[in-house]
């Protein structure tokens, strides 16, 4: 006979846990084929515009035969195109982002406020949310007469940036509880991107504590040289931080003092307006 402990163990073994979003699913409800197909799509990125069968297999952990079948299926469905050697994403993939941006509340209500900030200052603003290792741009504005040769990061919707090296990402991490912060660091070791990037866990946790205490984050050249940024939290229901509002600018155009003295109050006021709407 099974003991209660054995029965509990069996039940636990049938539950899958997603360490990134904390979701759970029963094993019998999990469709491995969909998971593998999405793993193929996830293998593409801003630094990987094309994949061959070998690269796809290495990125996903599949066999070459399995990777080939999934690539060919996605090509058949219209999400990939191939030149005979490499596979590329097609515009059809944008239907998912379009559906999200058209239906999600935060991007829609943020956009006019971001546009107003740009009209007032001719600087670039965005709203970002945390997704695992990265912060994702879900709304943004761009100065109409931006002429700087430096092209700061985070200028297009859907752009994904390492959370530990950006002002918005650090805001989002700062408002996680201590356990969640430690879990994040355990799962995503701090990678050096420039000589200014934080790579020591103790120093980084201390920084997150300071950011939460002051309620805003300034970041300079931690992700990209010649670029600095400022971010504040956006609160949703139950006083929970749901996103970050930030400004990104070339260091040759604005100073740290200007951002903190003149732009920070505008960010804080806009974040308050968004909180009232949300």
UniProtKB/Swiss-Prot annotation:
Q: Where along the sequence lies the DNA-binding region?
A: 53-72
Residues covered by the HTH iclR-type domain: 31-91
Q: What induces it?
A: By protocatechuate.
Read off the InterPro entries from this record.
Answer: GAF-like_dom_sf, HTH_MetabolicPath_Reg, PcaR_PcaU, Tscrpt_reg_IclR_C, Tscrpt_reg_IclR_N, WH-like_DNA-bd_sf, WH_DNA-bd_sf
Instruction: Respond yes or no to whether keyword Mitochondrion is given for this record.
Output: no
Q: Name one GO molecular function term.
A: DNA-binding transcription factor activity
| Keywords, comma-separated and alphabetical | Activator, Aromatic hydrocarbons catabolism, DNA-binding, Transcription, Transcription regulation
Q: Which domain of life is it from?
A: Bacteria
Give GO BP annotations, semicolon-separated: 3,4-dihydroxybenzoate metabolic process; catabolic process; negative regulation of DNA-templated transcription; positive regulation of DNA-templated transcription
Q: Which Pfam families match?
A: HTH_IclR, IclR_C
Per the database record, which ranges form the IclR-ED domain?
106-278
Function per UniProt: Activates transcription of the pca operon.
Q: What is this protein called?
A: Pca operon regulatory protein
Protein species of origin: Acinetobacter baylyi (strain ATCC 33305 / BD413 / ADP1)
The opening ranks of the lineage are: Bacteria, Pseudomonadati, Pseudomonadota, Gammaproteobacteria, Moraxellales
């Amino acid at each position: 006979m099974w003991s209660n402990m054995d029965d509990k163990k069996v039940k636990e073994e049938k539950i899958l846990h997603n360490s990134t979003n904390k979701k759970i699913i029963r094993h019998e409800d999990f469709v491995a084929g969909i998971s593998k197909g999405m793993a193929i799509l996830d293998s593409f990125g801003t630094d990987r515009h094309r994949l061959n069968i070998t690269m796809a297999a290495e990125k996903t952990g599949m066999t070459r035969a399995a990777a080939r079948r999934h690539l060919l299926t996605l090509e058949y469905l219209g999400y990939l195109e191939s030149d005979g050697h490499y596979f590329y994403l097609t515009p059809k993939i944008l239907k998912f982002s379009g559906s999200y941006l058209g239906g999600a509340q935060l991007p829609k209500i943020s956009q006019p406020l971001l546009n107003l900030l740009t009209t007032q200052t001719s600087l670039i603003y965005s709203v970002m949310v945390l997704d695992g290792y990265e912060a994702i741009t879900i709304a943004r504005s761009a100065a109409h007469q931006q002429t700087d040769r430096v092209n700061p990061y985070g200028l297009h919707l859907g752009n994904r940036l390492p959370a530990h090296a950006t002002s918005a990402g650090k805001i989002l991490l700062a408002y996680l509880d201590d356990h969640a912060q430690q879990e994040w660091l355990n799962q995503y070791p701090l990678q050096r991107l420039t000589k200014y990037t934080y790579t020591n866990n103790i120093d980084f946790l201390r920084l997150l504590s300071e950011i939460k205490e002051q309620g805003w984050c300034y970041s300079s050249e931690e992700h990209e040289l010649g670029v600095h940024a400022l971010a504040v939290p956006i609160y949703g229901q139950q006083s929970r931080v749901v996103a970050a509002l930030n400004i990104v600018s070339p260091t040759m155009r604005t100073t740290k003092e200007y951002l903190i003295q003149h732009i920070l109050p505008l960010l804080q006021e806009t974040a308050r307006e968004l909180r009232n709407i949300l």
